[in-house]
């Protein structure tokens, strides 16, 4: 698992390789990742937008931006946690993801929180640092 805290918001990510959806012979590798966001602060916040930077094993970069996560813009009161699962395909057997969530404080001010960088490794390649 990978974890990072920004402004009392903790983001934890756990990636999973999806062998049943991957086709290594066709250079198609798929991962799911489970994200848990915990508000450890004293103010209510809302997740407004996501921004992912996905890099494959040969350095090709794809950026993904959009409102919310999995169709939701969750509100997290102090002590609340929100979890979701999503996924990404790559044309290489490994890669890395990192990103940010744009949050809004209860007073309407926006700020970014970090999504920790995490490695996407398939069993079809020896693990390495990306």
From Swiss-Prot:
Q: What residues does the ApaG domain cover? A: 3-127
Question: Which PROSITE patterns is this protein grouped with?
Answer: APAG
Gene Ontology BP term (one): error-free translesion synthesis
Q: Which SUPFAM superfamilies match?
A: ApaG-like
Matching entries from Pfam families are given as: DUF525
Tell me where on the tree of life, at the top rank, the source sits: Bacteria
InterPro entries hit by this protein: ApaG_domain, ApaG_sf, Uncharacterised_ApaG
Alphabetized NCBIfam families for the sequence: PRK05461.1
Which protein are we looking at? Answer: Protein ApaG
Name the encoding gene, please: apaG
């Amino acid at each position: 698992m990978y974890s990072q805290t920004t402004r009392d918001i903790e983001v934890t990510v756990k990636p999973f390789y999806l062998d049943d959806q991957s086709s290594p012979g066709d250079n198609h590798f798929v991962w799911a990742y489970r994200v848990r966001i915990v508000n450890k602060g004293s103010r209510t916040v809302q997740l407004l937008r996501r921004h992912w930077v996905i890099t494959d094993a040969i350095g090709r970069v794809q950026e993904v931006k959009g409102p919310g996560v999995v169709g939701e813009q969750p509100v997290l009161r102090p002590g609340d946690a929100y979890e979701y699962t999503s996924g990404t395909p790559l044309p290489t057997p490994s890669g890395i993801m990192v990103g940010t969530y744009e949050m809004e404080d209860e007073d309407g001010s926006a700020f970014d929180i970090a999504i920790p960088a995490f490695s996407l490794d398939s069993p079809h390649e020896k693990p390495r640092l990306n």
